[in-house]
């Protein structure tokens, strides 16, 4: 028994440090959007809705293990070398979707850093009909490539939330 206690006393601080490290190298983008939760859920859960994030082509296979395939340029087709694929890790309808990059576009500059990352998008309905959107990006390392990729996605996620807000708020005003 004393041996197990000694092992746990050694292992637990290492596990806690690992958790602390992952929270240090992760980031969150948040926004309250003037639209009901159902409108925002459609953005991330349907092929047509996903185009609101700024892509030209999209295909969403909403299931655990399904892919969200997207292409920013109209000069190709889904599945070509410039398609980005995100794997759906988990989802709770109208509340949460967790994804990780499955395949990057051929010209994606961060060749290794993406392999350990994932994102959890959480939607929270507010009493006044608006929705709080929270995108937690996790698994980023401290190496130079990971730091650069983090900066890229911090800005990119803000721009995505801007586009989504403009899209759903425009629909609401009709």
Where are the regions that the model predicts?
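Positively charged n-region of N-terminal signal peptides that target proteins for export
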Residues: 1-4
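Hydrophobic/aromatic beta-strand elements that line small-molecule binding cavities or substrate pockets
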Residues: 29-31, 57, 83-90, 116-125
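Short beta-edge strand/loop motif at the mouth of beta-sheet-based domains
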Residues: 48-83, 91
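Beta-strand/loop substructures that line and gate deep hydrophobic ligand-binding cavities in soluble
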Residues: 108-155
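Hydrophobic pocket/interface hotspot
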Residues: 40-41, 50, 68-70, 88, ...
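A short, structured loop/turn motif at beta-sheet edges
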Residues: 34-38, 62, 89-97, 122-132, ...
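Hydrophobic h-region of N-terminal signal peptides that target proteins for export
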Residues: 8-17
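Hydrophobic ligand-binding cavity/cleft-lining segments
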Residues: 16-59, 63
């Amino acid at each position: 028994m004393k041996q197990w206690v000694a092992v746990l006393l050694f292992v637990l601080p290492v596990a806690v440090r690992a958790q602390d490290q992952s929270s240090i190298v992760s980031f969150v983008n948040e926004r309250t959007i003037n639209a009901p939760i159902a409108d925002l859920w459609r953005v991330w859960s349907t092929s047509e809705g996903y185009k609101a994030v700024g892509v030209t082509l999209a295909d969403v296979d909403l299931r655990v293990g399904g892919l969200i395939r997207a292409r920013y340029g109209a000069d190709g087709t889904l599945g070509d070398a410039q398609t980005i694929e995100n794997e759906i890790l988990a989802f709770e309808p109208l509340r949460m979707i967790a994804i990780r990059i499955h395949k990057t576009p051929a010209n994606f500059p961060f060749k290794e850093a993406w392999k350990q990352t994932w994102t959890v998008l959480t939607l929270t309905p507010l009493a006044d009909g608006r929705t709080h959107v929270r995108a937690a990006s996790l698994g980023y390392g401290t190496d130079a490539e990971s730091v650069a990729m983090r900066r890229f996605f911090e800005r990119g996620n803000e721009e995505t939330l801007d586009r989504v807000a403009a899209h759903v708020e425009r629909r609401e005003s009709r």
